[in-house]
Every structure is written in structure tokens, then in C-alpha cells.
A protein has these predicted regions:
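Non-catalytic accessory regions flanking glycosidase/transglycosidase catalytic cores in CAZymes
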Residues: 1-152, 172-209, 213, 280, ...
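Short acidic/His/Gly/Ser-rich catalytic and metal-binding motifs that mark active-site loops
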Residues: 58-61, 98-110, 160-166, 249-254, ...
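Short, charged low-complexity intrinsically disordered segments located at boundaries
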Residues: 159-170, 295-308, 358, 397-410
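Noncatalytic carbohydrate-binding groove/subsite architecture in carbohydrate-active enzymes
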Residues: 181-331
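Active-site rim elements
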Residues: 307-312, 355-363
Length: 513
């Protein structure tokens, strides 16, 4: 039995919530009914910032005289909804309009709504600056500087991969094309920064949001700190945060048991490497934004292609998420934002198909969604626990306090090797110096609680469940409590048995005298 203790009156350390943020994909689902259904469910306060694309392919055309014409009407539908819903935004400025492209035929494959994006660099970088300025100014005019200055803006998505200039990944290119790809991105960033800050110096900009290749990030950070600015001719370019993508694994690793390496530590280690590059270039004090993270890349692939993607449907992902929060919070400088990537939503045609989503095709909340909702209950003051120096393998615990004095104790048992059995771990939590009167809530995510996937599986995985079967599944498609709320006075002793890949949170609410 592991015993964990907390003095409820102890001072804590401020740790702002960096974990409740989302990359919502595809962006143009924001205007659709199914997109609204998802976003409405997230209006419970669990999502702080949401990342979207500007989708310049919907914005830019040319007039008959060859000058650029900007039409933000399609974009306005999306951002109007997001602002009205109370979301703060991180906007990724991409992709290139065909009308502006140096290579207009450099198009992606078919995407949502039969659209394609253009990966080309601009034919004229002054036009790119003009577009970035017009975009920023339009947002300020429409929503006000007070609102927009709270947002984040970054330049392009994964320029080291097949989204920028060439369809090949960085490592697949010969040295001269690698150099060209980096040089052109640095130029793109300089003109992006100039255009946005011509609208207002109060807007925060960053990049490069690379998908994997650290040498690309290294060269970009070298440019913004020591290189010659392509616009001003001076040394350096303003950067307010460094953005990055951190995926624990790629599908090929997931599919091969010998290379299976999904674990929160993988994401943390990648973040540390990026932090090291920031420090190398004198940017160690800047915020870092992980604007995409997930346990595995390529959310548009599911169980059909990679059977082990079943973990996206199960309690495994919930425990993974809580361990990731715990590990990141222990770092000297955690990320300012960490955005879980939901980029399989438009491929979600049947329930529990392994795509990277919060909800199934019928709208049932997966365990990872319940975990995201549960994590939003955590406070922003971290409290030290006693008895956590030598915890059993896979067991983790951390405590927080909210501004109103409520206390949250998070416990998890995460078995990284998905599909392998682990031990159930008994835990006792003792808390002293509590108020004279308080209530205790306990939330649970495991194989049974808050787990519609298990309920569906036990019914035989029906493709067309009956009304009664849907009812049985729906009862677990929400954040569940394993026991009724309790009353307490001055101190609390709580016992639990953490089964493999389970999460439990004890929430203590002070009652007025």
C-alpha cells in the first residue's frame, strides 16, 4: 500500500494551466453542423486556446488588373463563431493562395470538402507581407485589439515536412533543396512578422511549428537571433514564442511491436531538445508552445490501418495524458500551451475506429475527452505531496489548488506498453488541516468508468446498436464518479485501487462556515 500525504494549508507554486488546449482540424469544419456539435460540447470551459488555420486558399484572388483581392467572408464565419463561443485562438498563417504562388501546381492531395492546399513559396514576398498585414488588420477591425492581442500567431505548419515548397520530408531532400527550404522559410517568417506588426506591435508571433526535424528549427532560431532580416536588412527578427510539434510516435512504430515506443516521456524529451535549441540561441526565457501533440501522429489513420490505434479509444490515452501533464509540470519551464491535436475528425465515419478524436461518430465521449474535461478541474497552484519520492512503477500523483481554495489530488497508473498487463496499485491519500466542513468528489476513468469503448465492446462491438444498447453505452460516455459525494471535517483519508491505465481525481470543496 502506497500512502500519500498532503498538508492542505501548505504554500504552493504557481503553475498556470498549459494542458487544456486543442488543435481543431479541419478548420473549415468550424462552419459545419458537425463541427458546431463538437465545439459546443467543449464550451464547458475545458478548452482554453484552440488552434486554427487562416486557410488563405479561401481568401486571396486577383483582380483583373493583377492586384490582390482579399475576401475574408468564409473565414469570418469560422472566427465569428469561435469568438462568440468565448474561445481564444492560435492562428496558423497558411497555406499559400494559388494566386500568389511561385509554383501554383504544387498542390496537396484531396482534403476535406475536396479542397487542396498549395505548399509553394510566394512569387513575391512583398505580397505575402501585404496579405499578413491585411489579415491581422482585418482581425483587429472585426474583433478589437483587446481581444486579438490575447491570441497567438505563427507562420506556417510543419515547414520541415511536405507542407512547404516540396512534397518530400526534409531528410528525403538533397542538401541544396534542404538549404533552399530553410532559407525560404526564414524569408517567409520575416515578411510575416513585418506584416503582422505593421498592424499592431501588440500581437504575439512565433514559429516554426516543425513536425520533426530539429536541424530545421536550429537554423530558423539562428536566423531570427543572428541572421540578416530579409525585410529590414538588420540583424534579427522579432519572435515572441517558439512553437513546435511533439508526437510520441509515428504509425510505423505503432504497428511494429519491436519498435513500439509510445510513452509520455517521448514527448517530454522532444520538448527538452527544443528547449535546448532555444537556450543555444539565447531564447531560453521565451515561452514555448506545443501547438500539436498526440500519442501518435497521423490522426486520419485508424484501427483499420493500424490495429494498435485502439489505444485512442481506451482508458490508456487518459492515463497517458495525465502522466504527460505531471511530467511537463515538473520541468523548470513547462510549455506555455500544449495543444492536443484532433486531426481525424473528418474521417470519423464509424464508432471507435481509432481516429484521433474526442468523440465517436455517434458523439460518444471517449476516455481521452473525459480526461481532458477532468484535467480542467485542476488548479493553477501546485502543492507538494509527501510520500511520492519512491512510488511504484507506473504510479503517479500530484495535487493542485484553485483560487477558491478547492483542492484536487490526481492519481494515475499508466502502463506505457499498450496491450501489456500491469499491476493494480493500492493507494491511500491522507490530507490534514482541511476546513471544518467540506465535501469530497471522486472522479474515475478506467476500464469501466467513463469508458464507452468497454461498454460497446462488451455488447459485442455492434455496428448498429439498438436503442437499449446505445443507452448502455451512453451511460459511460461521460465523466463518472465511482461513489457518491461525501462530507468531511478537518481531515480526510481516502483509499483506492488504481487498475492499469486508470485515473482518479479527488476534489475537496470547502463549505462556508
Amino acid at each position: 500500500m502506497t500512502t500519500i500525504q498532503l498538508n492542505a494549508r501548505i504554500e504552493g507554486i504557481s503553475k498556470p494551466n498549459f494542458w487544456n488546449n486543442i488543435h481543431f482540424h479541419p478548420t473549415d469544419a468550424v462552419e459545419d453542423l458537425w463541427g458546431h456539435e463538437i465545439l459546443e460540447k467543449l464550451r464547458d470551459g475545458s478548452a482554453r486556446y484552440i488552434r486554427l488555420y487562416t486557410m488563405f486558399e479561401d481568401v486571396v484572388t486577383r483582380n483583373e488588373d493583377g492586384t490582390l483581392q482579399f475576401d475574408f467572408s468564409e473565414q469570418d464565419k469560422r472566427f465569428d463563431y469561435m469568438v462568440a463561443a468565448g474561445y481564444k485562438l492560435l492562428l496558423c498563417f497558411n497555406f499559400m493562395s494559388v494566386a500568389m504562388a511561385k509554383s501554383p501546381n504544387e498542390l496537396s492531395g484531396q482534403r476535406y470538402k475536396d479542397k487542396r492546399f498549395c505548399r509553394s513559396n510566394p512569387a513575391d514576398y512583398h505580397e505575402w507581407e501585404q496579405l499578413c498585414h491585411a489579415q491581422a488588420q482585418h482581425l483587429i477591425d472585426r474583433y478589437g485589439l483587446e481581444t486579438v492581442s490575447q491570441w497567438l500567431f505563427h507562420c506556417w505548419n510543419e515547414p520541415d515536412l511536405g507542407f512547404w515548397i516540396y512534397p518530400e520530408f526534409f531528410f528525403e531532400l538533397p542538401p541544396e533543396k534542404q538549404e533552399y527550404k530553410i532559407t525560404e522559410y526564414c524569408k517567409l517568417y520575416d515578411y510575416f512578422e513585418t506584416g503582422i506588426h505593421r498592424a499592431s506591435p501588440k500581437l504575439r508571433v512565433g514559429g516554426p511549428s516543425c513536425g520533426h526535424y530539429k536541424v530545421f528549427v536550429d537554423k530558423v532560431l539562428e536566423h531570427v537571433t543572428k541572421g540578416t532580416n530579409y525585410v529590414t536588412g538588420k540583424v534579427g527578427t522579432r519572435i515572441d514564442f517558439v512553437s513546435m510539434h511533439c508526437y510520441s510516435s509515428i504509425p510505423q512504430d505503432v504497428n511494429d511491436p519491436l519498435r513500439f515506443k509510445i510513452c509520455p516521456e517521448s514527448i517530454v524529451n522532444q520538448y527538452k531538445v527544443y528547449r535546448g535549441l532555444m537556450e543555444k540561441h539565447g531564447l531560453g526565457e521565451l515561452p514555448a508552445v506545443i501547438d500539436e501533440w498526440a500519442a501518435a501522429a497521423e490522426g486520419y489513420l485508424g484501427i483499420k490501418e493500424y490495429p494498435r490505434f485502439q489505444f485512442r479509444e481506451s482508458e490508456y490515452y487518459a492515463a497517458f495524458y495525465f502522466k504527460l501533464i505531471d511530467l511537463m509540470a515538473q520541468l523548470p519551464i513547462p510549455p506555455e500551451r500544449m495543444m492536443i491535436c484532433l486531426s481525424g475528425q473528418d474521417h470519423n465515419s464509424v464508432d471507435f475506429d481509432g481516429h484521433r478524436t474526442f468523440f465517436t461518430a455517434r458523439g460518444w465521449a471517449k476516455p481521452i475527452r473525459s480526461a481532458f474535461q477532468l484535467a480542467a478541474k485542476l488548479g493553477e497552484t501546485c502543492l507538494p505531496l509527501e510520500g511520492t519520492d519512491a512510488l511504484p512503477q507506473n504510479l503517479g500523483a500530484f495535487a493542485t489548488r484553485t483560487e477558491n481554495g478547492d483542492i484536487q489530488i490526481a492519481l494515475y497508473n499508466h502502463v506505457s506498453d499498450f496491450g501489456q498487463s500491469g499491476d493494480s496499485l493500492p493507494v491511500t491519500v491522507k490530507i490534514d488541516n482541511l476546513p471544518a466542513s467540506f465535501t469530497v468528489e471522486r472522479y474515475r476513468i478506467d476500464e469501466l468508468f467513463s469508458n464507452p469503448f468497454t461498454a460497446w465492446s462488451r455488447l459485442g462491438s455492434p455496428s448498429t446498436p439498438t436503442v437499449w444498447e446505445r443507452e448502455l453505452i451512453s451511460r459511460h460516455a461521460r465523466l463518472e464518479k465511482p461513489r457518491p459525494d461525501e462530507l468531511g471535517s478537518h481531515k480526510l483519508t481516502a483509499e483506492t485501487l488504481l487498475t492499469p491505465n486508470s485515473v482518479e481525481m479527488i476534489v475537496i470543496h470547502s463549505l462556508a462556515d
